[in-house]
């Protein structure tokens, strides 16, 4: 029964549902073709048979339908691989002609499919798959033996932690004491600060959409985490605008509990993967690091924050932070930029019903239209937004508060609070002669066209002028 899927949905849209299992443990006993023949014999007329499932099952469904001269349509999506036809795995003979399932299908007339050829093609990958699986298992065994910088077995966790947030941030927890005792402060200070791997400069010049900073490896992150002295009064926390418990998430990285580190981050920050990339840590948390007082580089807090958030995302175990019970109070947020999203996340964790209103067609504000892909990929932002949705935050796009809907209307709809995070959408010109001439653009306009509207792509219809000589006024990040 556990292998039967979509039963309720199929039953709801069908006049009759027959379930067949080989051993009769659920539904009727017998293979699918037995059920088909039984149904055909009890009906006056059957127009068509549709078969979706394992290829061998679809073949015999076709043979059964042909026995009664009933047309049959099969879906061969089970043999598709890359979806482009380039790999050739789904190349088949359909009615004597070469077809690609992912391009020409996946639905075909079952009577035209050369099933024997199909099974042969599928069989050609069997030995290769078995060999690759052996290589993969060998790789896993190698990972299990891998050790970290201090020589102990590395706990490369991929399962969500069962420890509470209180246990993960407790400086007096036994695991935390053991970490402090394992290395002397002088040994930690002797470790050089990690260098973030970057794209090759020559290759970087050929792409504007690939992230320049490649992120830390597990080994690099653990080594950098060893540099943290786990101060009793951590000044780095005071330097963080949202007061992340920085030593706690770093120490969880040091012991190899990367998902636990992400949990600590998300207890305070709604956008750890974003902040790990674009926050000016050198002016905030890292500027308070005790290493600087000893004329040593600060702990790479931003790199480690990004690592923990990226590890959680890539592991597939994206967790929702601890949530307070719903209090029934509605709060509106104007703007879906970093301030709006952060506020929305904080209020959702406190139990409020949060609704974000965004003027543009995409959520993210400056994270989407202002920061280039090579520094902050949109896919990273989208994952953070999706996590907010899982927390219960609702979003409405193409809605200008004040025009599409007024604040009075929001209050009438029951919103008890309105947070305005509209950002700096309008540019500030200098008021000099000629600044309104053609081909002079504010940074807001340029970045919106290039980042959000993909103007640099010749296939899009968003206009942008490319000059031989370009003057840039301003030397900041923009």
Regions found by a protein language model. Name each.
Residues 2, 71-89, 445-457:
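Short, flexible loop segments at boundaries between secondary-structure elements
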Residues 30, 55, 105-106, 114-327, ...:
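Ferredoxin-type iron-sulfur electron-transfer modules and their immediate structural context
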Residues 226, 233, 332-357, 396-407, ...:
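Rossmann-like dinucleotide/flavin-binding elements
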Residues 262-272, 304, 367-415:
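N-terminal Rossmann-like dinucleotide/flavin-binding domain of flavoprotein oxidoreductases
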Residues 352-368:
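Glycine-rich FAD pyrophosphate-binding loop
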């Amino acid at each position: 029964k556990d292998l039967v899927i979509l039963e309720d949905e199929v039953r709801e849209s069908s006049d009759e549902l027959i379930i067949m299992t080989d051993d009769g443990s659920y539904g009727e006993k017998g293979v699918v073709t037995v059920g088909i023949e039984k149904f055909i014999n009890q009906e006056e007329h059957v127009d068509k048979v549709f078969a979706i499932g394992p290829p061998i099952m679809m073949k015999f469904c076709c043979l059964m339908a042909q026995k009664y001269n009933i047309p049959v349509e099969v879906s061969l999506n089970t043999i598709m691989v890359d979806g482009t036809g380039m790999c050739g795995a789904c190349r088949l003979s359909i009615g004597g002609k070469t077809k690609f399932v992912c391009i020409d299908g996946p639905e075909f007339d079952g009577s035209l499919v050369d099933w024997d050829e199909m099974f042969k093609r599928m069989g050609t990958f069997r030995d290769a798959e078995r060999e690759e699986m052996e290589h993969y298992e060998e790789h896993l065994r190698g990972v299990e033996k891998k050790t970290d910088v201090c020589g102990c077995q590395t706990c490369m966790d991929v399962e969500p932690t069962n420890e509470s947030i209180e246990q993960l941030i407790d400086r007096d927890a036994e695991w935390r004491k053991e970490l402090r005792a394992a290395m002397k402060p002088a040994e930690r200070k002797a470790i050089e600060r990690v260098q973030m791997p970057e794209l090759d400069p020559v290759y970087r010049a050929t792409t504007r959409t690939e992230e320049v900073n490649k992120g830390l490896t597990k080994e690099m992150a653990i080594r950098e985490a060893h540099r943290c002295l786990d101060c009793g009064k951590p000044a780095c926390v005071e330097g963080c605008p949202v007061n992340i418990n920085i030593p706690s998430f770093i120490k969880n990285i040091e012991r190899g509990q990367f998902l636990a580190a992400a949990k600590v981050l998300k207890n305070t920050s709604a956008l750890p993967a974003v902040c790990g990339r674009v926050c000016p840590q050198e002016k905030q948390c890292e500027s308070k690091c005790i290493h600087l007082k000893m004329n040593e580089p600060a702990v790479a807090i931003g790199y480690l924050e990004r690592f923990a958030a990226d590890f959680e995302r890539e592991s597939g175990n994206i967790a929702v932070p601890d949530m307070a019970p719903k209090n029934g109070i509605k709060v509106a947020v104007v703007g879906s930029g970093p301030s709006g999203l952060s506020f929305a996340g904080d209020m959702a964790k406190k139990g409020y019903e949060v609704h974000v209103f965004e003027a543009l067609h995409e959520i993210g504000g400056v994270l989407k239209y202002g920061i280039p892909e090579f520094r902050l990929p949109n896919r990273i932002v989208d994952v953070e937004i999706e996590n907010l949705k899982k927390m219960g935050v609702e979003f409405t796009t193409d809605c200008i508060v004040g025009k599409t809907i007024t604040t009075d209307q929001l209050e009438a709809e029951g919103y008890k609070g309105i947070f305005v995070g509209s950002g700096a959408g309008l540019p500030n010109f200098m008021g000099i002669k000629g600044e309104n001439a053609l081909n002079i653009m504010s940074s807001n306009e340029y970045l919106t066209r290039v980042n959000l509207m993909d103007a640099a792509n010749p296939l899009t219809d968003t206009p942008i002028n490319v000059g031989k000589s370009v003057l840039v006024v301003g030397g900041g990040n923009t």
